[in-house]
């Protein structure tokens, strides 16, 4: 399943909200407490989580051997240092910090990581991310397939030493271990019951204090965290109402900015301007085509649908330049980003020629088409409405939109996939592999397009193990152009985060993956 889900789609849906543009000055904040709005996590199980909203909580409660710092460099976490690497680049030896404890007081040992990773790869766990983030480890694929009971490439040398062997030298392997699937969990906690994750026993800077779904979730500072203690006493998530409205009333301290507020927030004369923070995001928002289902099993139809959408109008007029138009797959700031990629830009004549060249010959011969998106309510985002209108006016094709609650959307995407779907992807680590290989390689868990290209697979496989950085990035640029030309998706735009932060909230920052490090945040009450 995909990484972005709730957070990405939530950001997009917020862009369509219209609310009153008057902000209260008062705050209900008290010292040491950060108040936030959210819809809440789908799960707090690191092995199961595949959505951004859940990740934000999990990264506060759990931790792994390594993590990404603010500049997205890989740094030690529970490991006391970066691992010793063998000359062939395939074996990594980790030395764990001593004294790291789960919330129940038990010390974390190397065997806990072996258990956690093998649990994630156990077919009975049902992880949709283990193959992607742990699959490079020797023996992981065998366990995922049910052929073995353990991962042969993970060896416990002693209580504080773990040796990991991967199938080939890969520059991005350590980055993958910063993903929640590789976080450590307490076996006794997991075996306490099916919904153990509602009372998680983690190793992160915060612990779960209370959780009433659709009402309130509270994180509390861990008193036994091995790193620098969190500055906040509590983080209170309000799981109902509407983000901008709660911010306006002083009930929350941070909010996403909708398009209806961007002019006011960007105006230097506005009091909101000093509360505005903008951070780029390594992301891609797109419409995916089910290439195994008519009519999108025909590349001419896929390309025609791409060419018939006026993305420039959507970005500039509807989304108010809060995002940047996407011609390719890789976002600006990602290694290998190619600003000269030849995208399928707005061209109605070419679109009509492609439909005529397709096996359908004419748009009137296309089967019914449904586009599925995640969300709630009766209205769809304005930008999606504009895309639907472009297809109707420019191609004469009527597309039905089906909007589903997130859990239903995920089920639909994996079990009953419609012809098209609205999605996004936020990077997990700063490497083109995280977009091109994970999304488009044949058989990838996250290849929701049912797309397969042997020539692309060969290029991606070559890039994955190439040790010369310049050559490697050039291979990924070739792969990106192949994907754009074959059009398993319609790239729409690359995102950015526009947030309002109350003046008394300090150090609240989102990295380019869209995740805040809440352990650094503090409240400055006068």
Description of each model-found segment:
Residues 36, 358-427, 469, 497:
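Ligand/substrate-recognition segments at binding pockets and active sites
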Residues 37-87, 118, 201-202:
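N-terminal lobe/hinge region of extracytoplasmic solute-binding protein
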Residues 81-132, 163, 246, 295:
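Aromatic- and charge-enriched surface segment that lines or borders ligand/interaction sites
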Residues 83, 315, 397-414, 437-503, ...:
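Extracytoplasmic/peripheral linker and loop segments enriched in polar/acidic and small residues
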Residues 138, 145-152, 159-160, 165-230, ...:
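Gly/Pro-rich hinge or "lid" segments in bacterial periplasmic/extracellular proteins
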Residues 209-220, 236-293, 316:
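Extracellular/periplasmic solute-recognition and catalytic clefts
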Residues 297-389, 393, 478, 525:
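Append "and occasionally in soluble cytosolic enzymes with long acidic Gly/Pro-rich linkers
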Residues 499-526:
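Long beta-strand-rich cores associated with HINT superfamily self-processing modules
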């Amino acid at each position: 399943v995909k990484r972005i889900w709730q957070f990405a789609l939530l950001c997009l849906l917020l862009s369509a909200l219209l609310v009153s543009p008057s902000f209260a000055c008062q705050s209900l904040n008290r010292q040491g407490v950060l108040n936030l709005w959210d819809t809440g996590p789908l799960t707090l199980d690191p092995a199961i989580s595949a959505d951004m909203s859940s990740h934000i909580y999990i990264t506060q409660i759990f931790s792994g051997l390594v993590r990404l710092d603010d500049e997205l460099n890989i740094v030690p976490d529970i490991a006391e240092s970066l691992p010793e690497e063998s000359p062939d680049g395939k074996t990594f030896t980790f030395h764990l910090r001593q004294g790291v404890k789960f919330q129940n007081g038990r010390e974390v040992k190397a065997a806990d990581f072996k258990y956690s990773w093998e649990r994630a790869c156990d077919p009975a766990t049902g992880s949709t991310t283990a193959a992607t983030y742990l699959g490079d480890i020797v023996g992981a694929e065998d366990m995922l397939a049910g052929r073995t009971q353990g991962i042969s490439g993970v060896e416990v040398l002693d209580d504080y030493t773990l040796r990991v062997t991967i199938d080939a030298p890969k520059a991005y392997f350590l980055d993958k271990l910063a993903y929640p699937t590789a976080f450590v969990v307490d076996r006794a906690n997991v075996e306490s019951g099916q919904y153990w994750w509602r009372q998680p026993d983690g190793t992160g800077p915060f612990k779960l204090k209370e959780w009433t779904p659709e009402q309130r979730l509270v994180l509390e500072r861990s008193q036994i965290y091995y790193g620098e203690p969190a500055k906040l006493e509590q983080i209170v998530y309000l799981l109902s109402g509407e983000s901008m409205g709660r911010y306006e009333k002083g009930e929350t301290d941070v909010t996403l900015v909708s398009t209806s507020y961007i002019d006011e927030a960007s105006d230097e004369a506005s009091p909101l301007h000093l509360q505005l923070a903008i951070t780029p995001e390594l992301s891609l928002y797109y419409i995916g085509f089910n290439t195994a289902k008519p009519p999108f099993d025909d590349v001419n139809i896929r390309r025609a649908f791409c060419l018939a959408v006026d993305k420039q109008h959507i970005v500039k007029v509807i989304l108010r330049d809060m995002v940047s138009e996407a011609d390719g797959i890789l976002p600006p700031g990602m290694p290998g980003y190619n600003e000269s990629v030849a995208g399928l830009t707005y061209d109605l004549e070419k679109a009509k020629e492609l439909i005529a060249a397709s096996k359908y010959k004419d748009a009137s011969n296309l089967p019914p088409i449904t586009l599925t998106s995640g969300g709630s309510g009766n209205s769809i985002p304005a930008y999606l409405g504009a895309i639907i209108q472009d297809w109707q006016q420019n191609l004469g094709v009527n597309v039905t939109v089906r909007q589903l609650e997130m859990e239903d959307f995920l089920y639909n995407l994996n079990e009953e996939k419609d012809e098209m779907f609205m999605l996004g992807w936020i990077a997990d680590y700063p490497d083109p592999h995280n977009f091109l290989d994970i999304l488009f390689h044949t058989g990838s868990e996250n290849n929701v397009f049912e797309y397969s290209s042997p020539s692309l697979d060969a290029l991606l496989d070559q890039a994955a193990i190439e040790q010369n950085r310049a050559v490697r990035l050039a291979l990924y640029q070739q792969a990106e152009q192949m994907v754009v030309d074959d059009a398993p998706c319609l790239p729409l735009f690359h995102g950015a985060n526009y947030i309002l932060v109350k003046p008394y909230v300090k150090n609240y920052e989102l990295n380019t993956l869209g995740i805040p490090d809440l352990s650094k945040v503090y409240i400055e009450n006068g």
